[in-house]
Amino acid sequence: MRLLVSGGGTGGHIYPALALIERLKQVEPDTEVLYVGTTRGLENKIVPDAGIELETMHMQGFKRSLSLENFKTIYLFLNSVHHAKKIISEFKPDVVLGTGGYVSGAVLYAAAKKHIPTVIHEQNSVVGVTNKFLSRYVDQIAIAFEAARSQFPADKVTMAGNPRAQQVAAKKDSDFSWTRYDLKDDVPTLMIFGGSQGAPKINKTVVDAIPEFNKRPYQVIFATGQKRYDDVKKQLAEGNIKPADNVKVVPYIKDMPAKMPRVAALVSRAGATTIAEVTALGVPTILIPSPYVTANHQVKNAQALVKNNAGLMITEDKLDARALLTQADKIMEDEEVRKEMAHAAEKMGRPDAADRLIKILHKAIDEHEK
């Protein structure tokens, strides 16, 4: 298969694509892939690091208010469609996959106009602007949340899940040991992670909660985000707060999927990739949705878990040390609650998500050949 993939800007658009590509190369080793992203997005580092060929285009998003910048955006979009058509003509893909972000809008639109098989993948429960626009032009639509189904043309939609789920499910039997962090393997572990950049409100809340976490019968590993580690260390020093042996504060946690099968529960944002990971692995989760995302989609993502008793939610406006400790204790101090939530999360998981998406890609190709 010759696959052209486009998605950019944030990790939520990129990592599912990389997980899909990894699986596709396992089952179809002769697969050739070209990734098309933006000149300024995270894909500029992540995609080449994964050994995948990358082409970039200059894009920018629409302002939500009337603005002269929007005329520039329209010009850039039309220019990018022209650029995308050239890339498509040169690469000659069998199918084009879009995973979100403005760049995928130009690429998938161009592919559809050239009558190339097209598929979009929507990771969130609330459909993004780009995928909403593309839904009328593409052949197939893969979703990760049932809530997204009604927002698309019904005859094009198939439930796939998030390919990242299959990638992390493969690490379920990880032999990782908490002794690497001077923690114990026979004590329930709560992992707290506000994202790769860290989240100031979450970090401050955890700092305030550490004196109580120090007294708990479970252990805590708290990743501050690389850029915010010094700030957290400063807050701890100013508050004269010293983490006990059962609490570890680290800048980041490398290879998170290898660690997650060994956690009793996770505190995190409610991004689509996180939801895919915790449901694939059956990890009880306390979700703190980011209030800084489009259409409040992280709240909707979190609600899907809460509704199925697979997670708890604290909105950021209600977040403080007491709220965090109350929810953490509810899970960490009751093994039966943990087991029930883990089972509920696993029931929601789609550990074959990449394989499902590969079938959808082939379906798009086959329908064009009829």
Curated annotation (Swiss-Prot):
GO cellular component term, pick one: plasma membrane
Membrane topology designation: Peripheral membrane protein
UniProt cross-references to InterPro entries, sorted A to Z: GlcNAc_MurG, Glyco_trans_28_C, GlycoTrans_28_N
Cellular localization per UniProt: Cell membrane
GO MF annotation list: undecaprenyldiphospho-muramoylpentapeptide beta-N-acetylglucosaminyltransferase activity
Enzyme Commission designation: 2.4.1.227
Any single GO BP term: regulation of cell shape
Pathway: Cell wall biogenesis; peptidoglycan biosynthesis
Keyword entries, A-Z: Cell cycle, Cell division, Cell membrane, Cell shape, Cell wall biogenesis/degradation, Glycosyltransferase, Membrane, Peptidoglycan synthesis, Transferase
Catalytic activity: Mur2Ac(oyl-L-Ala-gamma-D-Glu-L-Lys-D-Ala-D-Ala)-di-trans,octa-cis-undecaprenyl diphosphate + UDP-N-acetyl-alpha-D-glucosamine = beta-D-GlcNAc-(1->4)-Mur2Ac(oyl-L-Ala-gamma-D-Glu-L-Lys-D-Ala-D-Ala)-di-trans,octa-cis-undecaprenyl diphosphate + UDP + H(+)
Residue sites binding UDP-N-acetyl-alpha-D-glucosamine per the record: T10, G11, G12, N124, S196, I253, Q298
Similarity remark: Belongs to the glycosyltransferase 28 family. MurG subfamily.
Function noted in UniProt: Cell wall formation. Catalyzes the transfer of a GlcNAc subunit on undecaprenyl-pyrophosphoryl-MurNAc-pentapeptide (lipid intermediate I) to form undecaprenyl-pyrophosphoryl-MurNAc-(pentapeptide)GlcNAc (lipid intermediate II).
Protein's name in the database: UDP-N-acetylglucosamine--N-acetylmuramyl-(pentapeptide) pyrophosphoryl-undecaprenol N-acetylglucosamine transferase
Species for this entry: Limosilactobacillus reuteri (strain DSM 20016) (Lactobacillus reuteri)
